[in-house]
Amino acid sequence: MKYKKLSVAVAAFAFAAVSAQNSNSLKYPETKKVNHTDTYFGNQVSDPYRWLEDDRAEDTKAWVQQEVKFTQDYLAQIPFRGQIKKQLLDIWNYEKISAPFKKGKYTYFYKNDGLQAQSVLYRKDASGKTEVFLDPNKFSDKGTTSLANLSFNKKGTLVAYSISEGGSDWNKIIILDAETKKQIDETLLDVKFSGISWLGDEGFFYSSYDKPKDGSVLSGMTDKHKVYFHKLGTKQSQDELIIGGDKFPRRYLSGYVTEDQRYLVVSAANATNGNELYIKDLKNKTDFIPIITGFESNVGLVDTDGDTLFLHTDKNAPNMRMVKTTIQNPKPETWKDVIAETSEPMRVNSGGGYFFATYMKDALSQIKQYDKTGKLVREIKLPGSGTAGGFGGEKTEKELYYSFTNYITPPTIFKFSIDSGKSEVYQKPKVKFNPENYVSEQVFYTSADGTKIPMMISNKKGLKKDGKNPTILYSYGGFNISLQPAFSVVNAIWMENGGIYAVPNIRGGGEYGKKWHDAGTKQQKKNVFNDFIAAGEYLQKNGYTSKDYMALSGRSNGGLLVGATMTMRPDLAKVAFPGVGVLDMLRYNKFTAGAGWAYDYGTAEDSKEMFEYLKSYSPVHNVKAGTCYPSTMVITSDHDDRVVPAHSFKFGAELQAKQACKNPVLIRIETNAGHGAGRSTEQVVMENADLLSFALYEMGIKNLK
């Protein structure tokens, strides 16, 4: 093994007030340094803040409380912080209703009255009588326990749902009689990265890992996923292991039953890209049959028709295609195209006996309807340029639902007639926002290596390109995730106050298929940062904004994007928001689900070249003394078990210790919260009020427009 730990932290700690190098004399909380060094391929790497990885330690908890106080004290001086919060609450306070779905004799839908912490699940019977079915706001006093997943059996008489406490990825599953709404079985514990899929009335399949050791729930590595079957009326300890564990070691496993209840399908993966697919014929009681093995391609089951299986895959088709095969011999050499690959990335849903292919052209949606032979039925006319999602349902459905949105259009739900192809508005939100006053345009700019990159720029009409417009530059750039236009009330308030919201579709995402994704992975990862930097330069060169009025923003992998960009080009922007970011690239794979991200990043143990490449951009390892960094708000949560808070703690500590100018470095730590999903409305509003007000304040804005 080429990597080894050189020494453990010694007992003698070096204490220093990290404000010493800050010319603004901001007195940051004291952060101790430890003498800890690791060796990678003969190279010694110091890790003075290793102790911050232990979120259970009393000294870490004390440090967190000091940083929370420091951040809140700084934010409290911003004169319009309360005004921004009021604006957000005002625009947020509108009724939000989801598309309906039918289960048994009821029609279900989610609704949030406006400012409820969590949306409520309602149901309506044939007479139109409506009642609350499940209210997540009653799961906890503070509204921080959320509904993570929900699944009904085929008849709609039984329901199992999972809950997340404090945003944790570790869930519990609760089982109800759908008619009486009473719990009928014990609560299942320690469930993670799991769906819920019923087999008749007997029970359901779910996934989990071994129970975490005491104290390691938030940071311990998760490996060897398992698919279980829980039979109603039995204890969880009696659940049948279907696949996984030591005999079939895979990091991620999901099992689900097809609509016809004939097949159990299992997807297996070791990383976030590439999977194996297995199928078991429950009717004929076969063993698992491999559809594809190895992890070179992505493949998923779209639908079945008797013995025929419909799959979508990027095998021999970087932009995806849909193929058909049979249960008797489903291996790749038997696959036949139903919907061939095109020049645009595609994903496929099924509903009402048809297939609906969503194509993405320059990050904008196009929808086509096909029959089961692959014959084009129609191209569906959308309300405009933007993002459409939905078009899924059971074979018997006559109507399907989809949503449409873009950066200046609140999400509207449409009802689609499968036979006529006509759409009608089902639910249009009554938001205090007039799209007619705003504009969203797509531009293309050139990155450092000559690659053309699309970017959406949204703002209020009448913008003057004088270089003085407050601008948020936001992106992600990883894991084949595409950033398509979507409305946000937070961005609406930003634009209402004179701001520009710009989103470049940089490499690493899925906007142009597998090749676009791969061009931003491993030793091509710097393409992502260069694309982001070029976006900022384009906005400044063309008068939209200037360095003094630009903020960089991103979350999770996007937090890495911001951290790497601000350390590579500290002169690019005035403000930076690395949110819940992956910031220690030498150790990210040591925690929770981090090892599964190696397809995108590589690891420091892979090779000397990979170690050197990661270290060359790892934000934690590239903060340099004597450098003026942007005014920074590092954003994290103390219960984040996806990207552990140690990433943000260590990066924030490095910045506070080495910042060489008056720009402040804040570490905003949300308590009793996770990676982002399931947060209460109050938590989301307050974080965004802090983010927007900090950005404007640091840009020197005195009064809101």
UniProtKB/Swiss-Prot annotation:
Localization in the cell: Periplasm
Reactions that this protein is recorded to catalyse: Hydrolysis of Pro-|-Xaa >> Ala-|-Xaa in oligopeptides
Cellular component terms per the entry's GO annotation: cytosol; periplasmic space
InterPro entries, per the entry: AB_hydrolase_fold (IPR029058), Pept_S9_AS (IPR002471), Pept_S9A_N (IPR023302), Peptidase_S9_cat (IPR001375), Peptidase_S9A (IPR002470), Prolyl_oligopep/macrocyclase (IPR051167)
EC number: 3.4.21.26
Keyword Membrane: no
Keywords (A to Z) from UniProt: Hydrolase, Periplasm, Protease, Serine protease, Signal
Positions of the catalytic residues: S556 (charge relay system), H675 (charge relay system)
Domain of life where this protein originates: Bacteria
EC top class named in words: hydrolase
MF terms (GO), sorted A to Z: oligopeptidase activity; serine-type endopeptidase activity
Biological process, per Gene Ontology: proteolysis
Signal peptide start-end: 1-20
Protein purpose: Cleaves peptide bonds on the C-terminal side of prolyl residues within peptides that are up to approximately 30 amino acids long. Has an absolute requirement for an X-Pro bond in the trans configuration immediately preceding the Pro-Y scissible bond.
Subunit structure: Monomer.
Family to which this protein belongs: Belongs to the peptidase S9A family.
Name used for this protein in its record: Prolyl endopeptidase
